[in-house]
Curated annotation (Swiss-Prot):
Binds 2 [4Fe-4S] clusters. One cluster is coordinated with 3 cysteines and an exchangeable S-adenosyl-L-methionine. This is Ribosomal protein uS12 methylthiotransferase RimO. Keywords: 4Fe-4S, Cytoplasm, Iron, Iron-sulfur, Metal-binding, S-adenosyl-L-methionine, Transferase. SUPFAM superfamilies: Radical SAM enzymes. HAMAP family: MTTase_RimO (MF_01865). [4Fe-4S] cluster 2 binds at C189, C193, C196. Its main location: cytoplasm. It comes from Magnetococcus marinus (strain ATCC BAA-1437 / JCM 17883 / MC-1).
């Protein structure tokens, strides 16, 4: 069951003014009287958490609750947290505090906290935030509404071991617009990266079945979704844990047979599992976007060894060559960590050299976050935070002109752009073409003199590069060159 929801309904619009009045109600008195209550949700963290939030919202709607964007209108304040690194934890705790402040102003409201932060800290989170009425971890969201509606008094802490990824028959309110949706193909992770706490929070890798995913993508595309974005902690590991062993390649073939979505994108591909069979399939099938999101984390062999990653400098070099040889129009995106314990100037220079050599299309850079509970937390030779930040800035300064140069090849080309929003500041419509993933990459700014419908493909002639974005003119479909298709 898939429904659509405007993004504004997912993230609460917070105003901490003690004298603030609720915004103009979006529901009639009759609707409010017939509803079980009103719910507002703050969803933090990654795309996998977004899917969890969408399923929570779907369950609330199915059970007769109304969704609101203004927390002053909400009877239930839900914060779905992220606890991956220090910055994410800080944002989650600030959001909890903001909702707790509103609860103090309006004591009848209930504050529910879910997600990775509650999975990580459990009862300790209740000590830090005593205003919480109900605490759930990273999963078992099917128990949320029964716990809230139970007649007998309930304990607050209901954090348990995480469960499997929810199936397609769980109601879900899509928050990413009518044209694009994340498809979570698995839960958990089997890798042992020393910097990462996710396996402790989300458990081991558990794949959804081929049938279940096929049913979901068919439903999504039947309802007008043009872009399916496959996500998990390690998308290339898919199917290896199933009783009847499968693979990402088999899943992709099943998805192609199950739906007509023109864009099928994969995120979080573990480098050592990007094999020839997968590359050949992507090269062969036009609907499988040749967009490779492969988090490499570093390029120096010794740093990778301390991170407990399988690859080494020569293997990551070879991977880039293999992808481009097999899929000539491939877009390569990766993320890197700088300031990992023991990272020397020479090891950092190896990373800089790799960035210059590999000419990746998109790069994200993070400073190492020293997380208690990870193996890296106990490593010696911690890098000073100021040094790590300087290295991050240096790496991004190196990558920016590379990205701009890679984008230049699109100038003069006509591309199909998926229209997603209108930018008031620049007075233009905004969308993405196939080489841009949502939220993490640049966008296409569309110059036109007409109103465009959201969620459709339009032909755009790219005229210039603006930082990480592209700028272009809207064309009529009749202006497309022969054999040019929109998707």
């Amino acid at each position: 069951m898939e429904l659509e929801l405007d993004l504004g309904d997912l993230d609460l619009d917070v105003d901490l003014d003690a004298d603030a009045e609720p915004a103009e109600p979006r529901y009639s008195p009759e609707q409010l009287a017939n509803a079980k209550g009103t719910v507002g949700v703050i969803s933090l963290g990654c795309s996998k958490n977004t899917v969890d939030s969408e399923q929570m919202l779907g369950r609330f709607v199915r059970e007769g609750y109304l969704l609101v964007a203004d927390p002053l209108e909400a009877d239930l304040l839900v914060v779905n947290t992220c606890g991956f690194i220090a910055d994410a934890e800080r944002e989650s705790r600030e959001s909890i505090d903001e909702m707790a402040h509103i609860k103090q102003l309006y004591p009848h409201k209930k504050l529910i906290v879910t997600g990775c932060l509650s999975q990580r800290y459990g009862a300790k989170l209740l000590e830090d935030h005593p205003q919480i009425d109900l605490l759930l971890g990273a999963g078992h969201y099917d128990t949320l509404i029964p716990l809230l509606e139970a007649k007998a008094p309930q304990t607050v802490d209901h954090v348990t071991e995480p469960d499997a990824a929810a199936s397609h028959d769980v109601p879900r309110l899509i928050t990413t617009g009518e044209s694009s949706a994340y498809v979570k193909i698995a839960e958990g992770c089997n890798n042992s990266c020393t910097f990462c706490i996710i396996p402790k929070l989300r458990g081991p890798f558990r794949s959804r079945t081929l049938d279940d995913i096929a049913a979901e993508v068919a439903l999504l595309t039947d309802e007008g979704c043009h872009e399916l974005i496959l996500v998990s902690q390690d998308t290339t590991w898919y199917g290896r844990d199933l009783p009847q062993r499968s693979s990402l390649t088999e899943l992709l073939q099943r998805i192609l047979a199950s739906c007509e979505a023109p864009w099928i994108r994969m995120l979080y591909l573990y480098p050592t599992l990007v094999k020839k069979e997968l590359l050949q399939l992507i090269a062969r099938e036009d609907r499988l976007l040749p967009y490779f999101d492969i988090p490499l984390q570093h390029a120096d062999s010794q740093v990778l060894k301390r991170m407990q990653r399988s690859e080494r400098l020569e293997t990551v070099r070879q991977l880039v060559k293999d992808v481009r040889a097999s899929v000539p129009d491939a877009i390569l995106r990766s993320t890197f960590i700088v300031g990992f314990p023991g990272e020397s100037e020479a090891e950092f220079q190896t990373l800089l050299d790799f960035i210059q050599e590999s000419q990746l299309d998109w790069v994200g850079v993070f400073t190492y976050s020293d997380e208690q509970g990870t193996a890296a937390y106990d490593l010696p030779d911690k890098v000073d935070a100021r040094v790590a930040e300087a290295r991050r800035d240096q790496l991004m300064a190196l990558q920016q002109p590379i990205t701009s140069a890679r984008l230049q090849r699109w100038v003069g080309e006509i591309v199909a752009v998926l229209v997603e929003s209108y930018d008031e500041e620049h007075a233009c419509f905004v969308g993405r073409f196939w080489a841009q993933a949502p939220e993490v990459d640049g966008q296409v700014l569309i110059q036109c003199n007409e109103e465009l419908e959201m969620g459709i493909f339009v032909p755009v002639a790219i005229t210039q590069v603006l930082g990480y974005d592209l700028y272009g003119d809207l064309l009529e479909v009749d202006d497309l060159p022969p054999d040019e298709e929109l998707a």
